[in-house]
Curated annotation (Swiss-Prot):
The gene is nudL. Mg(2+) binds at E83, E87. SUPFAM superfamilies: Nudix. Gene3D superfamilies: Nucleoside Triphosphate Pyrophosphohydrolase. Its EC number is 3.6.1.-. Belongs to the Nudix hydrolase family. PCD1 subfamily. GO terms for biological process: nucleoside diphosphate metabolic process. This is Uncharacterized Nudix hydrolase NudL. It comes from Escherichia coli O6:H1 (strain CFT073 / ATCC 700928 / UPEC). InterPro entries: CoAse, NUDIX_hydrolase-like_dom_sf, NUDIX_hydrolase_dom, NUDIX_hydrolase_NudL_CS, Nudix_NudL.
Amino acid sequence: MEYRSLTLDDFLSRFQLLRPQINRETLNHRQAAVLIPIVRRPQPGLLLTQRSIHLRKHAGQVAFPGGAVDDTDTSVIAAALREAEEEVAIPPSAVEVIGVLPPVDSVTGYQVTPVVGIIPPDLPYRASEDEVSAVFEMPLAQALHLGRYHPLDIYRRGDSHRVWLSWYEQYFVWGMTAGIIRELALQIGVKP
């Protein structure tokens, strides 16, 4: 199923009907979480960030708000909400969490849990100067169009890893972020 137009109700009903299967073995044991913020509009948006070029890891990359689970977090969901507040000033109380996607093993040694949440359209995003250089919204229907993602096989430490690449306006979306978006599309029944 391809989406030229996707309403929030369509997205929510498909996400709720096709619950993710979470029971898979992971390679990494350090926990992290990202928030997949879906902006509540008749034609919903997907909120993304561009990481600061001054960061040691993933500098300048497009990403979801998120990071490592710390000792104060009660769950991976709490970690995703805390990180979203720290990075782009999304109050945890403004997020309607609708579920999680299966965890993803990162090349940096984390098991990353994507948390899907609905946010209001009128939030005043404020990028953390230390971590985020830009905050932008991509139409969800465009983000979930699988034809926009192109595979690239990378060989690292003797193993082959497939990563996905795409552009949105001036933003290069690739790696784990593109993979998570593709997983979300597949989860709601978009066919490759």
